[in-house]
Amino acid sequence: MTLSVNLCSGAEALPTEQEAASLAVECIEPLAQLPHDLPIFLVGMMGAGKTTIGRGLARALGREFIDLDHELEARCGVRVPVIFEIEGEAGFRKRESTALQECTQRRGIILATGGGAVLAEENRRLLRERGIVLYLRASVDELFRRTSRDRNRPLLATADPRGTLNDLMIKREPLYKEVADLVIETGAMPITTLIKAILPKLQAYEKKL
């Protein structure tokens, strides 16, 4: 069963990804524990806040955080855009699926997946079967605002990046919802407030397992 949680009531703008990540690492203290050590997987569009929120959740829960894109970069020794340039999207997706298959076997982690990780049916199966999946959702306008200055997004290197985001959202959102146990509307809430709002939702969901 998928629960939809709207956490958009805050009025403050979400900091930049770099600022929010620093807040997550430096300011969030351990706040809670979950009854199980099931891994928590974050899915959603680029710019939805998977890395930032993932780091904050890991800090709050005292867990290890893994960013799948960063894991791929560490394995390949180059940035994601370079992998795309050399091997194309198909080559990147193959590497992504291999890394996902390995990372999802680890207990007690917070894993931020890439925006397109859900495209492969086998990846979706692994996410559903091996952990708790949070779909971090934001509007196309908010996604565009957050990614407009980011040059590390090869799929947005187009003449109309906002239109590309909209097309990707139409294609991918049904897949995010297919695997999601919880849908979290990230909105424009400060990262610390957002993390504190997500934690009780996770605790309530785990108690039902």
Swiss-Prot record:
EC top class, as a word: transferase
Molecular functions per Gene Ontology: ATP binding; magnesium ion binding; shikimate kinase activity
Main location, first listed in the record: cytoplasm
Pfam families in the record: SKI (PF01202)
GO cellular component: cytosol
Protein's UniProt keywords contain Transferase: yes
PROSITE patterns: SHIKIMATE_KINASE
Positions of substrate binding: D69, R93, G115, R172
Keyword match NAD: no
Binding residues for Mg(2+): T51
Subcellular location: Cytoplasm
Binding site for ATP: G47, A48, G49, K50, T51, T52, R153
HAMAP family for this protein: Shikimate_kinase
Family to which the UniProt record says this protein belongs: Belongs to the shikimate kinase family.
Protein name as it appears in the record: Shikimate kinase
Organism: Bordetella avium (strain 197N)
Gene field: aroK
